Amino acid sequence: MDVAHPEEVTRFSPDILMEKFNVSEACFLPPPISIQLILQLTWLDIGVFAALTAMTVLTIAIYLEIVCYLMDKVKCPIKRKTLMWNSAAPTVIAITSCLGLWVPRAIMFVDMAAAMYFGVGFYLMLLIIVQGYGGEEAMLQHLATHTIRISTGPCCCCCPCLPHIHLTRQKYKIFVLGAFQVAFLRPALFLLGVVLWTNGLYDPDDWSSTSIFLWLNLFLGVSTILGLWPVNVLFRHSKVLMADQKLTCKFALFQAILILSSLQNSIIGTLAGAGHIGCAPPYSARTRGQQMNNQLLIIEMFFVGILTRISYRKRDDRPGHRHVGEVQQIVRECDQPAIADQQADHSSISHI
């Protein structure tokens, strides 16, 4: 007797699955609207939703406390704004996840909004490092006599033979472009996805080789890797110098948010698409996977928000930007003791 291979088995239509196998109709329907969801919630579901909403509110309260602290303790307005925008990432993701929890049909759009905001975080993280030196001019002046190792992850860690470089202004512009392209391409590609979705061409359930959804996500993955590389290069060179500014903690939280908001969503979506996450009325398998991801993100961002509060509570009176003349004046002031010592040595030798 011939045995049919898995790829030869004909998929049953939804009507046959509902009639012959008693599969719920909700497994083939779009996500429920909010009022339908609320009417179908059990007391246990209401308790879970209320607890997750309360955690979101606490995450917002933690961020507001961070803002008040930064307004009072960070004197430079440029550095203060950068820290405030970057520390808001866990709060924004928690809010969008909570909205997706209560409005299941908006999950795709709130996920896009969170991803677009975090795309700006690549550029903000680069600015935090640059402003930690005192601005672009101060950083270039400091790194003029240093070499930087560029064979770092995530795209060049397998190339240890790459030479160390001096960070010139032209190379710094390439670093800025690498981080900024994520902030530009993510909103542009997500907007393109929404336009294609209205025409039925953007389907998150379609993982075939001809799927526009698959190719857009692959392009976003490459863009993310290229955007993370310049930030990682500068971080590895600056983490010891900026240890008092808790740069390592800030960068670790940045990477944690990147993994939790991107990789976790992809893993759960793949499991749901492969049938490892079953449907549970009123949710289909895909919607249930998205709800699971939102619930996990709310809990995770609550704890990330607490760690963010610890990492960003640092009094800072140093400027985040200096003009060229100010940098040259600081360099001259730093060189004056060395020049005085050299003159003293010459005078002592002449007396001898």
Swiss-Prot record:
Residues 1-45, 104-108, 195-210, 272-294 are extracellular. Expressed in liver. Residues 67-82, 130-173, 232-250, 313-352 are cytoplasmic. It holds the Pfam family Solute_trans_a. SMART domains: Solute_trans_a. The keyword Membrane applies. The chain crosses the membrane at residues 46-66, 83-103, 109-129, 174-194, 211-231, 251-271, 295-312. Glycans are attached at N22. GO terms for cellular component: endoplasmic reticulum membrane; membrane; plasma membrane; protein-containing complex. One of its GO terms (biological process) is bile acid and bile salt transport. It catalyses: taurocholate(out) = taurocholate(in); prostaglandin E2(out) = prostaglandin E2(in); estrone 3-sulfate(out) = estrone 3-sulfate(in); dehydroepiandrosterone 3-sulfate(out) = dehydroepiandrosterone 3-sulfate(in). It is a multi-pass membrane protein. It is found in: Cell membrane; Endoplasmic reticulum membrane. GO terms for molecular function: protein heterodimerization activity; protein homodimerization activity. Interacts with slc51b. The Ost-alpha/Ost-beta complex is a heterodimer composed of alpha (slc51a) and beta (slc51b) subunit. Belongs to the OST-alpha family. This is Organic solute transporter subunit alpha.
